[in-house]
A protein has these predicted regions:
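Transmembrane beta-strands of outer-membrane beta-barrel proteins
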Residues: 1, 68-72, 102, 116-118, ...
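Membrane-embedded beta-barrel scaffold of Gram-negative outer-membrane proteins
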Residues: 2, 109-121, 144-236
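Signature of Gram-negative outer-membrane beta-barrel scaffolds
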Residues: 2-111, 133, 237
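Outer-membrane beta-barrel translocator domains and adjoining extracellular loop/strand segments
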Residues: 3-12, 80-88, 128-136, 176-185, ...
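Surface-exposed loop/turn segments flanking beta-strands in extracellular/periplasmic regions
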Residues: 3-41, 136-142, 180-196, 242-260
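Hydrophobic, lipid-facing positions within transmembrane beta-strands of outer-membrane proteins
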Residues: 51-57, 100-104, 149-153, 164, ...
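Gram-negative outer-membrane beta-barrel transporters
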Residues: 62-65, 170-172, 196-303
Length: 304
């Protein structure tokens, strides 16, 4: 499977707010500023490309009681960056980044009603372009791939009137690359600074329960519960990118500072770690389905 993308990034003048022109200082090819009008490009103008090549194989083995599944894959991604607002307009290319993934699972049917299963997988994800080539055209040396190591075990039980699935999981998410925005209120439009984080590790553990009760053909009762414990595992390094402004409040460059970010032990935010769902479905006549759901969420920590 081969895919390619070419993306142009630019900001365009759409409204002069009654003026005849605007002076932009972002283009280094115009030392004293560039007079722009409607439709002209300001602030930034660059082009990036992404080339992706990958493939995978999979296999499945089934008997009366046992089902085995496995797959393996490899991919390569290559980035380039060209800034039209620099004098050199150099085409910057990063070396191809290889990633791998291996997944496997097994289901054993103890009886007609009871089955146990296990799933495991190791997946790598290449860092995004922003973490490989920055706005100045600097290329990161040997950037780390994100890694997901996931293990899950569980049991299925089912009859004509009752179905139950219980599973426990443990996931190590290593070497994440995150981008965070910090509102500064500076500049002509209240621009934001950016933090590029490297080496962010998280551990996700939890238990999930799904139950379906069907006392007759007209009524179904569903109960789903999920109990998670997701935390950051260790601190991380980060580059703080701070915009620089001229007297008119326009961005004319930026400075970067390296920091250590104390993340160890913080809960992962912006997603509930505990949830309950109760549902009632009624089918009074053929073709008509009435459903009521009650959902509640807990341990939903704020992001940072």
């Amino acid at each position: 499977d081969w895919r390619t993308a070419r993306i142009e990034h630019a900001r365009e003048v759409r409204d002069l707010l009654g003026g005849d022109y605007y002076v932009d200082y972002a283009d280094d090819n115009f030392e004293d500023g560039k007079v722009v009008k409607l439709g002209d490009i300001i602030a930034y103008h660059n082009e990036t490309t992404v080339d992706w090549l990958g493939g995978f194989v999979q296999a499945n083995y089934t008997t009366d009681k046992l089902n085995l599944y496995g797959m393996g894959g490899i991919s390569s991604i290559e980035y380039s960056y060209q800034d039209w607002f620099t004098v050199e307009q150099e085409l910057v290319k990063a070396d191809p980044i290889q990633t791998y993934q291996v997944k496997g699972g097994a289901l054993y049917n103890v009886s007609d009603n009871l089955g146990v299963f296990i799933n495991t997988g190791l997946v790598e994800k290449a860092p995004i372009l922003d973490n490989v080539i920055d706005y100045s055209g600097n290329v990161a040396t040997d950037p780390d791939n994100e890694k997901f190591l996931h293990n899950e075990v569980g049991v299925n039980f089912g009859t004509q009137k009752l179905g139950v699935r219980v599973s426990a999981y443990d996931t190590d998410w290593q070497d994440r690359n995150l981008t965070k925005s910090v509102s500064t209120g500076q500049g002509s439009s209240g621009d934001t600074d950016i933090i590029f984080l490297r080496g962010v590790n998280q551990k996700h553990q939890g238990l999930e329960v799904e139950t379906k009760v069907k006392p007759n053909d007209m009524v179904e009762l569903d109960f789903i519960a999920s109990f998670g414990n997701w935390k950051f595992d260790g601190d991380a390094e980060g580059t703080y990118q701070e915009n620089e402004y001229n007297d008119e409040g326009q961005v004319v460059g930026y400075t970067t500072t390296e920091y250590q970010y104390a993340l160890n032990g913080l809960y992962v935010g912006d997603m509930p770690q505990t949830s309950y769902i109760v549902g009632l479905t009624v089918k009074p006549v053929k073709g008509l389905r009435l459903q009521a759901l009650y959902k509640t969420y807990d341990k939903n920590y704020s992001d940072w």
